[in-house]
């Protein structure tokens, strides 16, 4: 005789917070930077352009611009006849890329499942939003990469190769302070934003250890900048940190949605709208509809009986364009973006602050320890 047949089974207690890290977002610093600059008072994208571009699906968006003129003549004599000095115009074409994500839900699937509808919906929404944001962040980094300056009026004592400042390990603690003079020499003296990765975050924290009351005050290296961090700025081999320095007010992002979303159409059980998704502070198009069909293969034995059931469809999409301030002659005219990368030091070797001996002549050969 035994009670084994009626022994309590495993206790299952729904607790959605336990798996929260399975859809955790990263930091999308490049995307956040473009969005912030779009909404700034000195944005390169006017409200009119944003509004017209948002409704431009099916059309090409072009912006009239005037090219740089480096041939202005300054005379040393007065004349009764003032010469012409005409500008040259061009059309800047906005380049769009389409992004689309979606998922489905079968409402009655949860009648015999420990996972609730809300738990499953929330995790699906979180993971598609995370993927959407990550793709946009990667595109923002690619835009910075493509827009980095080819011209440095004064590179100070850094090596400038392949349009990148190569920072030796010994100068890692100096580059943040030197970026401002380099930008100023390129005629960009404004506030600098830094879009960097974990290596740059580490560097800033090390500089912060040497503050106003420490041996050397390194606050001026970084305190006049705005930092944005993302894992999508990737180090090349033998590099320990990579960043883009960008003058304030020189980038932005445009979006547009499909025609039905723009019109908020409702037809044949389909619904379109314009929404803002978590992690992405941009307007995107949404599409929702339901259908009836065989759902028996959705969850194996748990859905084997579901041969005619309702299924919900959730879709989100947008065309996105990352915009850099126009430059019709990037070979001659500097762009407001500088890329720099810091050489890696050996593993388990700390980053040391340089020590300069100004009275070396007072010590005998062999140095101060002799």
Tell me what each language-model feature is.
Residues 53, 183-187, 298-300, 313:
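A general structural signal for short secondary-structure junctions and capping/turn motifs
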Residues 149-226:
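Extended, solvent-exposed, turn-rich assembly/linker loops in the middle of proteins
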Residues 98-112:
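Residues forming anionic-ligand binding surfaces in small-molecule and nucleic-acid pockets
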């Amino acid at each position: 005789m035994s009670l084994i047949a009626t022994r309590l089974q495993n206790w299952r207690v729904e607790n959605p917070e336990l798996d929260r890290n399975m859809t955790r977002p990263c930091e999308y610093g490049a995307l956040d930077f473009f969005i912030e600059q779009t909404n700034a008072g000195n944005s390169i994208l006017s409200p009119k352009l944003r509004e017209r571009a948002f409704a431009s699906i099916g059309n090409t968006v072009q912006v009239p611009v005037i090219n740089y003129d480096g041939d202005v003549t300054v005379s040393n004599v007065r004349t009764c006849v003032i010469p012409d000095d005409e500008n040259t115009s061009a059309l800047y074409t906005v380049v769009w890329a389409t992004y689309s994500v979606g998922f489905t839900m079968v409402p009655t699937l949860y009648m015999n499942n420990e996972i609730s509808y809300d738990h499953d919906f929330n995790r699906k929404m979180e993971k598609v939003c995370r993927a959407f944001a990550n793709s946009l962040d990667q595109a923002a980094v690619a835009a910075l990469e493509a827009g980095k300056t080819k011209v440095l009026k004064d590179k100070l004592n850094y090596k400038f190769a392949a349009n990148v400042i190569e920072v030796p390990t010994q100068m890692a603690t100096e580059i943040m302070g030197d970026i401002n003079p380099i930008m100023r020499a390129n005629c960009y003296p404004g506030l600098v934003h830094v879009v960097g990765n974990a290596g740059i975050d580490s560097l800033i924290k090390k500089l912060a250890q040497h503050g106003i009351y420490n041996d050397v005050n390194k606050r001026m290296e970084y305190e006049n900048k705005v930092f944005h961090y993302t894992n999508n700025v990737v180090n090349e081999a033998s590099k320990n940190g990579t960043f883009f320095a960008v003058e304030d007010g020189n980038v932005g992002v445009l979006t547009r949605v499909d025609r039905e979303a723009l019109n908020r159409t409702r037809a044949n059980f389909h619904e379109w709208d314009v929404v803002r998704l978590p992690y992405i502070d941009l307007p995107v198009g949404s599409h929702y509809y339901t259908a009836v069909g065989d759902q028996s293969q959705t969850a194996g034995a748990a859905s084997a009986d579901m041969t005619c059931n309702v299924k919900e469809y959730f879709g989100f999409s947008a065309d996105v364009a990352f915009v850099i301030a126009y430059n019709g002659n990037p070979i001659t005219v500097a762009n407001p973006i500088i890329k720099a990368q810091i050489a890696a030091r050996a593993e388990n070797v700390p980053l040391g602050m340089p020590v300069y001996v100004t009275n070396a002549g007072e010590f005998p050969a062999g140095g101060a320890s002799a």
